[in-house]
Amino acid sequence: MLSPKRTKFRKQHCGNLKGISTRGNVICFGKFPLQALEPSWITSRQIEAGRRAITRYARRGGKLWIRIFPDKPITIRPAETRMGSGKGSPEYWVAVVKPGKILYEISGVSENIARAAMKIAAYKMPIRTQFITTSSLNKKQEI
């Protein structure tokens, strides 16, 4: 599972998911990306499940880039505890994803294989996504 090696602070505020992604919304590394259409938190387990699905379908062909990293700690209080007594302890890590953010990029495989692999990975995500090609940025297909 992905998680930061060290952080300046152990706990964070919740924040908000308003607006669209201004960073990480252009194709940088691969040829076929998977782009988010909704705002959400994506856990490190979901990112890993998507990565496994893509690499297993591509069968060691091509190269995969993961464009998001879970750097936000989510805290959970123990069950049946009374109010007060501070914030809970960090349980897992999430990546904050806004609409337009690119989640994965793949290259070195055909478009059909990339589309099918990204479709399998899209089922693992808690949000709606779309598959984009570099040649046809105008006609985007929602997955």
UniProtKB/Swiss-Prot annotation:
Q: List the disulfide bonds.
A: none
Keywords in alphabetical order:
Chloroplast, Plastid, Ribonucleoprotein, Ribosomal protein
Q: Name one GO cellular component term.
A: ribonucleoprotein complex
Is Ribosomal protein given among the entry's keywords? yes
State the organism of origin. Marchantia polymorpha (Common liverwort)
> Any idea what this protein is called?
Large ribosomal subunit protein uL16c
Cross-referenced NCBIfam families: rplP_bact (TIGR01164)
Q: Which Pfam families match?
A: Ribosomal_L16
Which lineage? Eukaryota, Viridiplantae, Streptophyta, Embryophyta, Marchantiophyta
